[in-house]
């Protein structure tokens, strides 16, 4: 069936306008991008499958959405000329007949280009036919336009264009080559047209990436593992042909949960590969092909690229089958390199920095692998599979911009396996390739669904599978050991269980030393070859703003030559020298009005460098060496008018700041994929649950449903709902109602979502565990009851109902985990027995550890700290005489502010230390509260230098220096049992005084003193009692010490 040719007119003019704007703006010295060209020539010949995606047809797809063979485009800075054929004829003799029959709409190119006339940018279409004279006239007009536009003309010298139409143009153009200078325009097309993608382009690349991920994880991995497990023989070429055929299986792609419902499998095609390699022969270049060797265990490399609506995505993975220790170590290092590169894929990064940081890490950590590391860490990707002008090597000075798409590749080639005795596995290569979008603050990895972690890529078909099991058992043993601990609380500090098992304490101290050493080493490896932020603060970037593009956009009121506040354009227009001068609100600091005599004065202060040393002194400017206007003062007799203007400017400034703040708050909110509802059956539901944070309106219970790729909370009012996708779930918790008023299921998200007008990372579904109680005293039932039978029955019923609630919610949480198991969703339950109270926000709450986190889920604001994100914990205010201490968590992401849990009772100190040690978190302690803002600025400013100077050891050093004094102080003031008994007797005697005792004591102090035993007598009694109990002085001293 013929394809209906419809050119998106809006997209055409938007893209052409942005291209022309970039062209006109390129007036820097040396004309770095466009090379000072006055015109650009894009020539398309006949369709050529071998050169299907070059810059010339990429320009066709970018502007028109289609490739039109035998077409010439000539651009000047204000107009576009198109020379094309009217119908199929001698100009298309070598064009593939199947292509033309499938796209009969292409036979009349002029017809489809005709609607582009009359737009905001002039487009002239010159139609040619079989008549040579007519074609010559069209070419002559284009040549005249090129000569008039300037000496330099942009061409694509590396692109090939064949066929009669192309040959005719080349002959015609040869006549003016002596009059013009040809400039390679491909870098300009890359930067101004293809690099930064709009929304439609990003959606196409994302869908292509999801198709790649699905084909890799849902098909190739299953096929590969089945062949190896069943020990079947198959060549790389045969396996790649199987994958090749799978692209025509529309049902397979329809089943992939990540692909949207509107995804059209008919629009996908291969961009590269598929390529499968194993058995010691590897080629990591894009030109590689699958050979006829058999698939072998060891290192298996698989890669391919898929094109959707002409936009490409690429993926490559390395699979380790029964790997050696050195192979596992090198792959783990490759993951470290991958994270290092990904961390800097963000707006404003220089392209060469990505490669330089990766190679710097190789040189610092494994210099023997430097010669094996790939020559670049990726390239630009889009319509072209690999943009040669955006290769991420050590020489590319281009700046990454938000909206760019890149293929990021880290790899090791031809590494020798010293442990191998088999020549087929003596040499191996490894590669990880992902397609990513450059974001404001980091990358969006489109191909992340095909896992790259060790668990996802490792396969053990031999005897090496067994040793992996103890890891999980070890974790459970630690948790069980902790839950058996019982803390006794007493009234007096002297009676608290301050004694610690010396053997356990020594083991814990030794373990903490190992963790501290490990942290320092990890820090040096992680930040090798990196540079920190200046002064520990990420520098702000200047954001351009514009009040009006043209004079005719100015408001009509400017003719009155009065001060005018244009709220729509966020601009203040001031008449200067008889002309209206606009000042954008972003340039204004504040405005104030004052009176002096019969005049009112309006003073407008502008932002400029060096205005002070306050918090806002880091205001960025485009050129700080330029001349700046500091302030402007206007005088008028119209007092009310100036007062109104000052108020309007103040309001405008407030609104601008509020909008900026709202935009900043919403930066990390990403648009979720659509929830795929279950249609063929009723979804599993949990009724009568409340939502936190709640939806706007009346508080009423709703129900939670489990669908194919997420949860949906349905409100009974106004058909409102909240969707939570499994792919966005970081933690899933179930907390029973024991000792609580509610039973709950809590979801902690990777990226925040919007619920109503609130941004949140935590979504909670709960039901109250208690019912209203009624006093039945005096009613008819009560008359026939004796004793506490009724109260006993109510308690029994309460226990039964709570147990039923726990069973219902736990079963539903397990069903959620089962539905989301492909996304790694698992249920976690807090350990109440090892919980401790503290103040993470405003109120004192119970904080409970889980297997993977530390949580407080009972009352908002919630606390969820992921354990593997913690760098170190520090215990503050640990000193004798204080009833509580504070706990500070520092995260591996040093830009993330530390989390404080304050006012933890000192009785919990040993329990907290035991728990931290059991989950392998390094901790230190000290007597004072530290200024963590200053500390983290120091760390961020030079992280490598920080770890080189000892890292977090300064916290431990502070603890050690205070430890001796603390012990002495405690042992000096702590009472022995005999002294405490004597003190208690004295207290009892004091309590027998009458109301006038205080007055008598003040009048006759000496008599009161003589009436009791002195301290020497008490000391003698205490020693005698100790001797009787068999304790000498040394043992008693040990007992008193902590």
UniProtKB/Swiss-Prot annotation:
Residues 959-972, 985-1017 have a biased composition (Acidic residues). GO terms for cellular component: FACT complex. Signal peptide: none annotated. Residues 464-519, 776-795, 958-1042 are annotated as: Disordered. InterPro entries: Creatin/AminoP/Spt16_N, Creatinase/aminopeptidase-like, FACT-SPT16_Nlobe, Fact-SPT16_PH, FACT_SPT16_C, FACT_SPT16_M, Pept_M24, PH-like_dom_sf. One of its GO terms (biological process) is constitutive heterochromatin formation. Residues 467-478, 504-519 have a biased composition (Basic and acidic residues). It is found in: Nucleus; Chromosome. Residues 498-522, 636-672, 796-819 form a coiled coil. It comes from the Eukaryota. Residues 480-489 have a biased composition (Polar residues). Its main location: nucleus. Keywords: Chromosome, Coiled coil, DNA damage, DNA repair, DNA replication, Nucleus, Transcription, Transcription regulation. Disulfide bonds: none annotated. Component of the FACT complex, a general chromatin factor that acts to reorganize nucleosomes. The FACT complex is involved in multiple processes that require DNA as a template such as mRNA elongation, DNA replication and DNA repair. During transcription elongation the FACT complex acts as a histone chaperone that both destabilizes and restores nucleosomal structure. Forms a stable heterodimer with pob3. The spt16-pob3 dimer weakly associates with multiple molecules of nhp6 to form the FACT complex. Belongs to the peptidase M24 family. SPT16 subfamily. This is FACT complex subunit spt16.
């Amino acid at each position: 069936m013929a394809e209906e040719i419809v050119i998106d007119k809006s997209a055409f003019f938007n893209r052409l306008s942005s291209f022309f704007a970039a062209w006109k703006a390129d007036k820097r010295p040396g004309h770095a991008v466009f090379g000072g060209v006055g015109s650009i020539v894009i020539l398309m010949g006949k369709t050529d499958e071998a050169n299907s995606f070059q810059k010339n047809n990429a320009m066709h797809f970018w502007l028109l959405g289609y490739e039109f063979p035998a077409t010439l485009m000539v651009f000047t800075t204000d107009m576009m000329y198109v020379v094309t054929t009217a119908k199929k004829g001698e100009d298309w003799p070598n064009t593939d007949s199947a292509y033309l029959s499938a796209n009969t709409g292409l036979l009349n190119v002029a017809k489809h280009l005709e609607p582009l006339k009359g737009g905001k940018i002039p487009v002239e279409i010159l139609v040619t036919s079989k008549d040579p004279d007519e074609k010559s006239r069209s070419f002559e007009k284009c040549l005249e336009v090129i000569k008039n536009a300037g000496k330099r003309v942009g061409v694509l010298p590396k692109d090939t264009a064949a066929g009669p139409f192309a040959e005719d143009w080349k002959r015609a153009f040869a006549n003016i080559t002596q009059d013009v200078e040809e400039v390679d325009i491909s870098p300009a097309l890359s930067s101004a047209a293809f690099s930064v993608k709009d929304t439609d382009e990003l959606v196409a690349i994302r869908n292509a990436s999801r198709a790649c991920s699905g084909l890799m994880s849902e098909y190739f991995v299953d096929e590969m593992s089945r062949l190896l497990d069943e020990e079947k023989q198959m060549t790389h070429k045969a396996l790649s042909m199987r994958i090749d055929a799978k692209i025509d299986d529309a049902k397979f792609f329809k089943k992939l949960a990540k692909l949207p419902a509107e995804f059209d499998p008919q629009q996908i095609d291969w961009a590269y590969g598929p390529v499968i390699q194993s058995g010691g022969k590897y080629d990591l270049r894009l030109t590689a092909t699958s050979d006829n060797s058999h698939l072998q265990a060891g290192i298996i490399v698989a890669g391919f690229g898929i094109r959707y609506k002409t936009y490409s995505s690429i993926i490559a993975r390395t699979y380790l089958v029964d790997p050696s220790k050195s192979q596992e170590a090198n792959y783990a290092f490759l993951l470290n390199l991958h994270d290092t590169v990904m961390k800097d894929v963000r707006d404003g990064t220089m392209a060469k920095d990505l490669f330089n940081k990766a190679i710097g890490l190789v040189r610092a950590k494994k210099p023997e692998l430097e010669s094996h590391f790939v020559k670049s860490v990726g390239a630009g990707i889009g319509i072209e599979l690999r943009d040669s002008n955006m290769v991420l090597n050590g020489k590319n000075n281009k700046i990454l911009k938000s909206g760019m798409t890149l293929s990021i590749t880290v790899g090791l080639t031809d590494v020798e396996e010293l442990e191998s005795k088999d020549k087929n596995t003596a040499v191996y290569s490894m590669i990880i390739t992902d397609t990513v979008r450059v974001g404001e603050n980091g990358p969006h990895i489109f191909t992340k669904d095909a896992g790259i972690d060790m668990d996802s890529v490792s396969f053990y078909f031999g005897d090496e599978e067994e040793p992996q099991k103890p890891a999980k058992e070890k974790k459970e043993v630690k948790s069980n050991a902790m839950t058996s601990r019982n803390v006794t609380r007493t009234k007096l500090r002297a009676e608290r269980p301050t004694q610690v098992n010396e053997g356990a304490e020594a083991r814990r101290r030794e373990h903490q030393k190992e963790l501290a050493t490990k942290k320092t080493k990890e820090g040096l490896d992680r930040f090798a070859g990196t540079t920190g932020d200046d002064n520990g603060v990420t520098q702000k970037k200047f954001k351009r703003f514009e009040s009006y593009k043209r004079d005719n956009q100015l408001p009509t009121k400017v003719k009155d030559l009065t001060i005018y506040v244009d709220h729509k354009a966020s601009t203040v227009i001031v008449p200067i020298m008889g002309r209206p001068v606009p000042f954008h609100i972003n340039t204004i600091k504040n405005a104030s009005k004052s009176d002096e005599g019969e005049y009112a004065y309006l003073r407008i202060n502008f932002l400029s460098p060096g205005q002070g040393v306050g918090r806002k002194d880091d205001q960025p400017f485009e050129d700080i060496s330029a001349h700046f206007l500091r302030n402007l003062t206007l005088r008028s007799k119209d007092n009310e008018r100036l007062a109104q203007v000052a108020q309007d400017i103040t309001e405008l400034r407030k609104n601008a700041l509020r909008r900026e703040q709202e935009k900043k708050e919403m930066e990390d909110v990403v648009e979720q994929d659509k929830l795929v509802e279950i249609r063929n059956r009723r979804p599993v539901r949990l009724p009568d649950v409340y939502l936190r944070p709640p939806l706007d309106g009346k508080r009423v219970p709703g129900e939670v449903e489990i669908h194919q790729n997420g949860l949906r909370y349905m409100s009974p009012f106004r058909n409102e709902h909240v969707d939570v996708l499994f792919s966005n779930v970081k933690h899933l918790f179930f907390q029973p109602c024991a000792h609580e008023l509610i039973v709950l299921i809590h979801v902690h998200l990777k990226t925040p979502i919007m619920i109503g007008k609130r941004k949140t990372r935590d979504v909670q579904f709960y039901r109250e565990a208690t019912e209203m109680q009624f006093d039945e005293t005096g009613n008819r039932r009560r008359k026939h009851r004796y004793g506490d039978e009724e109260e006993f029955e109510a308690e029994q019923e309460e226990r039964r109902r709570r147990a039923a609630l726990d069973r219902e919610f736990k079963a539903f949480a397990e069903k959620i985990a089962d539905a989301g198991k492909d996304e790694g969703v698992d249920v976690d339950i807090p350990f109440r027995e090892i919980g401790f109270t503290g103040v993470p926000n405003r109120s004192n709450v119970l904080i409970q550890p889980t297997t993977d986190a530390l949580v407080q889920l009972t009352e908002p604001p919630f606390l969820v700290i992921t354990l593997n994100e913690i760098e170190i914990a520090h215990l503050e205010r640990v000193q004798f005489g204080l009833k509580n201490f504070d706990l500070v968590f520092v995260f591996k992401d040093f830009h993330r502010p530390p989390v404080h849990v304050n006012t933890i009772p000192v009785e919990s100190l040993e329990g907290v230390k035991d728990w931290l040690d059991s989950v392998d978190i390094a901790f230190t302690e000290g007597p004072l509260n530290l200024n963590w803002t200053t500390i983290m600025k120091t760390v961020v400013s030079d992280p490598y230098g920080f770890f080189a100077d000892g890292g977090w050891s300064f916290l431990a050093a502070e603890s050690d220096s205070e430890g001796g004094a603390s012990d002495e102080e405690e042992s000096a003031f702590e009472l022995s049992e005999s002294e405490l008994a004597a003190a208690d007797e004295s207290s009892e005697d004091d309590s027998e005084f009458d109301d006038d005792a205080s007055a008598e004591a003040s009048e006759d102090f000496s008599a009161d003193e003589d009436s009791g035993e002195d301290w020497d007598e008490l000391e003698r009694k205490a020693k005698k009692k100790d001797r009787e109990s068999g304790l000498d002085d040394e043992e008693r001293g040990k007992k008193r010490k902590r």
